[in-house]
Amino acid sequence: MNNKSKIIIYQLFPRLFTNTQPNSVFNGTIAQNGAGKMNQIDTRVLNSLRDMGVTHVWYTGIVQHASKTDYSAYGIHKSNPHVVKGNAGSPYAITDYYDVDPDIAVDVNQRMKEFEQLVQRTHACGMKVVLDFVPNHVARQYRSLAKPKGVEDLGQTDDKGMFFSPNNNFYYITGKSFSPSVDMGEGDDKYVEYPAKATGNDCFHECPGGNDWFETVKLNYGVDPWNGSKHFSPIPSTWTKMCDILLFWAAKGVDAFRCDMVHMVPVEFWHWAIAKVKEQYPDVVFIAELYDVGIYHSYIHYGGFDYLYDKVNLYDKLCAIVKNEESAASLTQCWQTVEGMQAHMLNFLENHDELRLASPQQFGDAELAFPAVIVSATMSTSPFMLYQGQELGEDGKGATGYSGDDGRTSIFDYTTMPLVEKWYSHGKCSIHKINNKARRIRAFYTKILKMCATEQAISQGAFFDLMYVNYQNLNPQKQYVYLRHFDHETLLVGVNFHADDAELEIDIPAHAFQCLGIHSGVCFMKELLSGKQKTAEFSPTAKFQMRLPAHGGVVWKIVH
């Protein structure tokens, strides 16, 4: 991994991204609503992402998962529909860790080859591949038919008469049948599981509810859930099996793994497995989905993760500021919370789990998030991630099936994304069919991402918070200012969460010049988002005049 480049991750779900089926119906089947394919993610699509500033593509929904679509004609085990959420199913209810999902293949029999070709195309276009690794749980009917010769399947040798054994891959509710509160069918259609296995969200009884992850089974990493005791010597078989899965995909050319719900798996496993993978593939990057600031340090410095989701710190704070629930000045607390770890944070404002920025449930307008995007992308050297269609203002409106109208693009249903569909335009990848607002949003994201790629002060530079000397010069409820500096270049970033423009005169303290090694004097300056230029004094005694647009920001580049 090149530590001098700013990582920009684009999350792309092939089943949704290139699906252009017109007139989708509610809760439709794949025959009715269609599905995007890996082969449709061609060089034109990939070049458009690269040209926008993307360095890594996170392909979601690649690994085979539970679905109500019947592929038994291709030798794929058919899922019982009562343990599948939505017609398309959750991409996080894995049915075979060693196989590719048939929905996204043009030729189902060649699905692995189509994935390998996608990896090759992505690399040829100068980007890296990120793949999901789901370590905590599998689909209730997990069964690997594609596993390499000699590989023992999960649960194959489990002693099902024991609730917990360090030699088992699952937890068993002995003497009990699986009896969730949701309908499991009747007669030949009924889903039967005996003994019941523990459910994925740490539900260690036979009766999970509808809001539980009832379609999944919890994996056993050698922790007895009743007393918390750890049984890690000898190495549990689940550890070995899951590490082998990581090595399998790394051998396919996967450059990074986005690891699902890592805090539900013991940090000792990550310490062991990440080291094992990096012995053979030292450049493979590990990204953690993690929601507890208190264990950030452990999962970085002991677990071995390169990057962690900073959801409960920066993401939550930015969303609260846009909604006028917190002050812009409270962003100071965010970098202080992760001080010393900030380079390991993965910043974002959208992914498949979170509300669409433009959704009525979030901000109702993607442009209201512009100042938050500027902060998330430029505050540190850490990676920035965006979700498919975020750059167009997809709003996730309307119910398409299982998910309902929840402000998200459904991952459970066969559906499309209206703005992405217009932009994709059957492979043309053109702005001509999208509306002016979507064009403005895309242009904004392109400027931000390209700036992240080209400005060393963002990708490598130091950070200096200017708020402590400027509370009298701005509205701390709505405005935030900071410096990024590298070598002979300084960026002065100002953002405005207010509905009105703001004219500011900002103080740059002498301590900032000393701390960052900035030379004062008359300098050439350029505002990178608007292109405006000026020559002015940049020193501790000179006020820096800036005009902040409503719901926007500026990035002034000062060349010394």
Residue ranges and their predicted role:
Residues 256, 522-541:
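Solvent-exposed beta-strand/loop surfaces of large extracellular or lumenal domains
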Residues 15-18, 63-65, 135-137, 250, ...:
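Short, solvent-exposed loop/turn segments at secondary-structure junctions
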Residues 56-61, 129-133, 258-259, 386-389:
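Short beta-strand segments at enzyme active-site cores
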Residues 1-128, 136-147, 154-160, 165, ...:
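N-terminal structural segment of carbohydrate-active enzymes
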Residues 20, 29, 67, 82-83, ...:
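Loop/helix patches that line or flank the sugar-binding groove of alpha-linked glycan CAZymes
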Residues 20-39, 361-365, 534-545:
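Short, polar loop/linker segments at the starts of domains and inter-domain junctions
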Residues 3-9, 13, 93, 103-120, ...:
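Alpha-amylase-like alpha-glycosidases and glucanotransferases acting on alpha-linked glucans and related
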Residues 536-560:
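C-terminal beta-strand-rich structural cap/linker in extracellular carbohydrate-active enzymes
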